[in-house]
Amino acid sequence: MKKIILTVFAATSLLLYSTPSFALFSVSVGIPMSQTITGKKSGQTYGNAPDKTSGYFLAVQLPFALGFGIDSYTTKFKTGESDGAWDKDMDTGLKTNMTNIFYQLPVPVVNLIIGLGMGTTEYDCKTRDGKGCSAYYDKGSATQWYTSIGMPLIPLFDIHLSYRSITAKNIKDKENGTKDDNSGSVTGIGIAFNF
């Protein structure tokens, strides 16, 4: 009897695990793990030096594999005397807000998502005059493409890794009109709940 129960359990697990994990409705939440900036600051041979990233990714997938999401996160810059570092007193970071549309590809076993997004980037800092970075820099527009791969742990829950490639070349210095290129990439991790 134990062998039959074990065999049925194993067969059911394999069957459920190997079927596509499309859901009628899915909610996903994630966090950024790291950001790299490959673009250059205006007039420099280097870009801003990212340090710690915090924020969130939220997404809702509809029954026909199409979904919508938002990203909101801030990456603090390194401080000190190295290239790309900012003054410690300014506590400067790059604030990113994106709105996304994505599609889940019909791939068995894993949840594979591709998407596009658009939004803004801006410097977030403290200044000695108390006005903050918005008094000295204009917000810039940003676009991204991204992909996410998720592995279902149980039929109603999966864990996923994501990669975002961001183009953000136009945070403008209000004083001299130069633009900073903060293009780069962001990696993240998240969980999805399927209903």
Question: Where in this protein do the model-derived segments appear?
Answer:
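Repetitive helical segments and hydrophobic/amphipathic motifs
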Residues: A11-T12
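Short N-terminal segments immediately surrounding and downstream of signal-peptide cleavage
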Residues: A23-G39
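Gram-negative (and chloroplast) outer-membrane scaffold detector with strong preference
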Residues: I31, Q35, Y56-K131, D138-S141, ...
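Surface-exposed strand-loop-strand hairpins of Gram-negative outer-membrane beta-barrel proteins
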Residues: S34-Y56, A135-K139, K169-I171, D181
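Hydrophobic secondary-structure block in the mid-to-C-terminal portion of proteins
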Residues: L156-F195
